[in-house]
Amino acid sequence: MDHKSPLVSWNVFGFDIVFNLASVLMVVITAILVFILAIVCTRNLKKRPTGKQNFIEWVFDFVRGIIESNMAWKKGGNFHFLAVTLILFIFVANMLGLPFAIVTHDHTLWWKSPTADATVTLTLSTTMILLTHYYGIKMRGTKAYAAGYFKPFWPLAIINVFEEFTSTLTLGLRLYGNIFAGELLLGLLASLFFEQPAWGWIISIPGLIVWQAFSIFVGTIQAYIFVMLSMVYMSHKVADGH
């Protein structure tokens, strides 16, 4: 079944800027959930961690491993909290659309994974790429940073600049494509259950169970890949050899 998106358009200086209210809502919900998770896991910290403290410390150690695989910790440590926040946000965002969807009587879809919207994922990727430029200039200086685009020889400058755009697109669209495809198939299986009650459940229920499990795996891997590539791009900008 086709679903509509709750769109609102604002005219700014003659340009129509369109917002998907469902995506905005889900981004806010994701941010709130990550904030609550961080508060809960960091309350009453102990020298001998247990339970939730063990979990959050494992996340920090795991992300530190990602960073250290790409750059020295002396520089990479500056991005530790950024990377932890990013992986938690994307993981939670990827999971939100899996248990259920909320669709109103007019077939407007309100509850979904925000990362199933290309606008959200491209915004995330653009933000990360811009941050790599910011920290590259901040940590290396404008002259050294700009000179990196002309290495190993100056004709590569055009290719290096073009690579920034392709990196942004691939980083965002990879995440979007995987999450959108997963939720699309879940929707098809769910519609089969409701629209073909005589035999649809025979296919849809086992299919939903298997695909839910696979989608959790894919959502987790995609959060890891996004953060890993973000740190790869960051290391290229802040490393002295760039």
From Swiss-Prot:
The chain crosses the membrane at residues 21-41, 83-103, 118-137, 175-195, 198-218. It is found in: Cell membrane. One of its GO terms (molecular function) is proton-transporting ATP synthase activity, rotational mechanism. It is a multi-pass membrane protein. Keywords: ATP synthesis, Cell membrane, CF(0), Hydrogen ion transport, Ion transport, Membrane, Transmembrane, Transmembrane helix, Transport. The keyword tRNA-binding does not apply. Pfam families: ATP-synt_A. GO terms for biological process: proton motive force-driven plasma membrane ATP synthesis. Its main location: membrane. Belongs to the ATPase A chain family. This is ATP synthase subunit a. It comes from Staphylococcus epidermidis (strain ATCC 35984 / DSM 28319 / BCRC 17069 / CCUG 31568 / BM 3577 / RP62A). The lineage of its organism: Bacteria, Bacillati, Bacillota, Bacilli, Bacillales.
